[in-house]
């Protein structure tokens, strides 16, 4: 309802489906969206542009998710398109329906690119006209002699049905390989799970191979990638006249919107699915982030959704739960459902892929229900607060000197935002910052929150003037352990801090170290929850996404990086002292000498704050975006 050729849309979800409509869509956290609501600029260095040259035509049984998984597998791990813009151009685009284009485009987020946009044609014109916005169409094509930084050749004819194994969309294998050798491939997945979760919880996938065939327990088609009309219609065509069986295989289908849900009902698609035994749910993307159809413990689910990150589907490893999710296209999921849960490729099933030519869009369902208040303010209307709606705690400005206590060390190759703050059941607490913060890293490191709270208690004592180099006066409302006080006082002594510095020019905050944090969702809560717990920084070798780094800055978390050649020896409970941190941020330094206290010894380390513009530095000095706008009177 917002996209148009040549436009740009900034959305608060990491997945955007606008590129196929000639719109540059970028997913960002709430802080960046707030800047736009206040009519400020979206500041971005000019990104590199990658040409995705699309040729060929999709084979029978191949859908948009197969293309997307193949693309993710080719470019994610090597960082080929990270923070770049993809331009889809070529004769192959004309053979794709709009739903197929959108289904590929929405998954470009999983390549780590910044955004993606497609050249437009008559199909885009007709799509916009169908939605009552014919005037928003204009042809978009590269100019003659257009120069690109990189090239990806995407031959649709070469794509076959694919599968993305746990725990990332880039773990791409052909479905043909997985069907032929399920034991070997799934054994590797079990080893990766063991390496990440240790002996606390185990994932058993190889025992699902019976007589050489892989049996799965659940199939789901849902969300912004899976729940498109063409995908669901193709699934219904595959299942037409058959059934999913009465065994332990479950199959659920979620449409993406009420207008599409209505069209599926009116065209009889939903009827055919229901008769096959599929469960047709309301339009909701819940299964994608663990808010619906959570698999059973140790189950294997095949899904046409966007992600299969660890625990994103809703499992809780801290309670002994773990499940595996394999991403597949809706067509092969339906083929598997037709085979009662035995993994099957849609390429091996006869069905009619004919795309519905007489599509309809009934906007009345929105007109009757959606309130449109933009440009019609009602300042006298009171806000209604419930008991679970709470104010944000006061967030301090950046101090002159900073003492960080390490409260989590995550040495996985990548740390996702789903691990930093789970979604699903926690979403009901997003209006209550303190309650939501209790779930921070709960499915990855259950000890983080208690450790962060202990660090925050030390800072509360210090700020109250009750924590000195050798003495402490406990306050009843500040729960602090004597051993924590002794540890921080020893840190003061080793660092040579004087009484005046501790009382007036120091802040004690927590810090998370991760090799590469922030892959996945745009949810700013991945950063804000750390800040609510009095976190002060992240330290990493690189940030997985621009949007997570922006979230850190907007919430006042210093986004420090390490040089690739520098090892990080810090452990939970260690301290990192950064002298003159406020002065260095203010004057634009990108190098920050620091001291790591590890094992009773001091070690000099260097932290970096690179590619940080003047506005970002102002936000960091103020403590967060809220403070920044409060100071400006906005």
For the regions a protein language model found, what residue spans apply to each?
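Fe-S-dependent hydro-lyases/dehydratases of central metabolism
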Residues: 1-634
């Amino acid at each position: 309802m917002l996209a148009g050729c040549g436009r740009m849309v900034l959305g608060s979800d990491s997945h955007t489906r606008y590129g196929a409509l000639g719109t540059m869509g970028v997913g960002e956290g709430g802080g960046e969206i707030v800047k736009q609501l206040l009519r400020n600029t979206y500041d971005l260095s000019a990104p590199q542009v990658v040409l995705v040259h699309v040729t060929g035509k999709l084979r029978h049984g191949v859908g948009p998710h197969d293309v997307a998984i193949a693309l993710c597998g080719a470019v994610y791990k090597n960082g080929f398109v990270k923070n770049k813009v993809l331009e889809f151009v070529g004769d192959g685009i004309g053979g794709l329906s709009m739903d197929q284009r959108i289904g590929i485009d929405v998954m470009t987020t999983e390549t780590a690119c910044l955004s993606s946009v497609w050249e437009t044609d008559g199909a885009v014109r007709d799509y916009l006209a169908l939605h009552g916005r014919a005037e928003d169409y204009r042809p978009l094509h590269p100019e003659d002699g257009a120069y690109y930084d990189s090239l990806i050749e995407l031959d649709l004819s070469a794509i076959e049905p694919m599968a993305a194994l746990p725990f990332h969309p880039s773990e791409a294998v052909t479905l043909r390989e997985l069907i032929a050798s399920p034991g070997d491939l799934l054994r590797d997945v079990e080893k990766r799970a063991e390496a990440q979760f240790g002996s606390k919880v185990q994932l058993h996938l190889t025992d699902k191979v019976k007589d050489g065939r892989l049996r799965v327990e659940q199939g789901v088609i849902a969300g912004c990638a899976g729940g498109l009309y063409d995908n669901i219609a193709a699934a219904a065509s595959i299942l037409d006249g058959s059934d999913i069986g009465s065994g332990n295989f479950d199959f659920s289908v979620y449409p993406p919107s009420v207008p599409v849900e209505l069209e599926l009902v009116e065209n009889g698609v939903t009827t055919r699915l229901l008769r096959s035994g599929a469960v047709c749910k309301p339009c909701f993307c819940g299964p994608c982030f663990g808010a619906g159809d959570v698999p059973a413990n140790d189950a294997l689910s095949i899904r046409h959704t966007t992600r299969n990150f660890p625990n994103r589907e809703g499992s809780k490893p801290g309670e002994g739960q773990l499940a595996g999710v394999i991403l597949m296209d809706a067509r092969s999921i339906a083929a598997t459902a037709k085979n009662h849960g035995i993994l099957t490729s849609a390429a091996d099933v006869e069905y009619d892929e004919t795309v519905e030519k007489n599509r309809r869009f009934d906007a009345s369902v929105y007109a009757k229900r959606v309130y449109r208040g933009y440009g019609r303010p009602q300042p006298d209307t009171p806000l209604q607060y419930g008991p679970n709606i709470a104010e944000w705690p006061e967030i301090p400005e950046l101090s002159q000197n900073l003492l960080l206590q390490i409260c989590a060390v995550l040495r996985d190759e990548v740390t996702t935002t789903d691990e930093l703050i789970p979604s699903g059941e926690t979403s009901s607490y997003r209006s209550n910052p303190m309650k939501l913060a209790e779930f921070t890293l709960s499915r990855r490191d259950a000890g983080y929150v208690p450790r962060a709270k202990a660090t925050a208690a030390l800072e509360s004592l210090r700020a109250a003037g009750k924590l000195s180099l050798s003495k402490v006066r406990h306050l009843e409302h500040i729960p602090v352990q004597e051993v924590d006080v002794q540890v921080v006082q020893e840190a003061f002594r080793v660092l040579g801090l004087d009484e005046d510095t501790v009382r007036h020019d120091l802040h004690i905050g927590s810090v998370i170290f991760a090799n590469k944090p922030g892959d996945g969702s745009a949810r700013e809560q991945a950063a804000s929850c750390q800040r609510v717990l009095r976190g002060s920084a992240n330290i990493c070798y690189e940030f997985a996404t621009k949007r997570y780094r922006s979230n850190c800055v907007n919430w006042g978390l210093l986004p420090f990086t390490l040089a690739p050649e520098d090892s990080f020896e810090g452990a939970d409970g260690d301290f990192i002292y950064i002298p003159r941190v406020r002065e260095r941020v203010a004057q634009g330094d990108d190098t920050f000498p620091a001291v790591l206290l590890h094992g009773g010894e001091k070690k000099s380390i260097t932290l970096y704050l690179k590619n940080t513009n003047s506005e970002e530095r102002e936000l960091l000095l103020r403590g967060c975006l809220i403070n920044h706008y409060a100071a400006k009177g906005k």
